[in-house]
Design a protein with these regions (language model features):
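Structured N-terminal alpha/beta-domain signature
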Residues: 1-46
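A secondary-structure boundary/capping signal
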Residues: 149-150
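Non-catalytic, conserved peripheral segments adjacent to functional cores
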Residues: 8, 32-146, 155-156, 161-163, ...
Length: 181
């Protein structure tokens, strides 16, 4: 089996998935060019998963909070917001995909976050004690976007049996130093 640092880093031969998990290599790892290493929110290896077709088409990678993502934009404008440990981009954006059965684990982000629904089934977004359903059926109470205030607990999962693709725009820009579970 070939274990590679994605996208075009060095490779090593491993006997099996257990050896791949114990390899100690850093970065996004891919096994035999098809199965991607998922790490938990603390960075510990969890296992290898094949990318769903939408994730493959958009070059999404496993997100530590669950699902699949790719940063699509980071503002070149930086500043040091009050209460933050260092400078941040003024805003960032990602694609985020959740498959049926996947969830974005409960977590907090220091910055405000706007969720924007793109395609697939509806998404249940829990913000503190409230629940919002993002989706296309606005006449039925779904909304195409929702705001999570900075510091609020949040979690998300598909509301049905379809994958859901959203974007998340974070301002001040996302930094894993501002993420907690």
């Amino acid at each position: 089996m070939q274990l590679t640092i994605y996208p075009d880093g060095p490779s090593i031969e491993v006997a099996d998935e257990a050896e791949a998990l114990a390899s100690g290599l850093e970065g996004q790892l891919v096994l035999d060019g098809a199965r991607f290493l998922r790490r938990d929110v603390h960075g510990a290896p969890v296992g290898f998963e094949e990318r769903p077709p939408i994730a493959r088409a958009l070059d999404l990678l496993p997100h530590p909070e669950g699902g699949w993502y790719r940063q699509t934009w980071r503002s070149p404008v930086e500043f040091r917001p009050d209460g933050y440990p260092g400078p941040r981009a003024s805003a960032t954006g990602i694609y985020f995909l959740l498959q049926p059965g996947e969830e974005s684990v409960p977590h907090r982000v220091r910055s405000d976050e706007v969720w924007l629904w793109h395609r697939g089934g509806p998404l249940t977004l829990t913000v503190g004690d409230e629940t919002v359903v993002l989706g296309p059926l606005v006449e039925e109470g779904q909304v195409p976007q929702a705001v999570v205030p900075g510091g609020a607990w949040q979690a998300a999962r598909p509301a049905g049996d379809e994958a859901v693709l959203v974007s998340c725009v974070v301002s001040p820009g996302f930094d894993f130093a501002d993420f907690s579970t």
